[in-house]
A protein has these predicted regions:
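Catalytic cores of transferase enzymes with a strong primary signal for eukaryotic protein kinases
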Residues: 1-5, 33-36, 56-59
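Residues in the helix-turn-helix
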Residues: 17, 28, 57
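Short basic helix-loop element that most often maps to the first helix and adjoining turn
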Residues: 2-21
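Short, charged recognition helix plus adjacent turn
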Residues: 6, 12, 31, 59-72
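Recognition helix of helix-turn-helix/homeodomain-like DNA-binding domains
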Residues: 24-38
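DNA major-groove recognition helix of helix-turn-helix/homeodomain DNA-binding modules
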Residues: 42-57
Length: 72
């Protein structure tokens, strides 16, 4: 499960905008957002770069990330 929708909503970015910048169709991006299809690792890194977030933020909740940091 990914958090793309949460990041898009938080940043006020539309799926159409992401699709255009990613070079994918709106339907494909919508599939990612709705968790019907998972993006490839390469695409996930591109999405993170476009949205200016860490890949971890697209995959895990903030609580998961904090717990992981505290264990290190």
């Amino acid at each position: 499960m990914n958090k793309i929708k949460l990041v898009l909503d938080k940043k006020g970015i539309k799926q159409k905008w992401l699709a255009e910048h990613l070079g994918k169709s709106f339907n494909m991006v919508n599939s990612y957002v709705q968790n019907r299809t998972q993006p490839s690792i390469e695409t996930l890194y591109k999405i993170a770069s476009i949205l200016d977030v860490e890949v971890d933020e697209l995959l895990y909740s903030k609580d998961d990330i904090e717990q992981s940091k505290n264990k290190q």
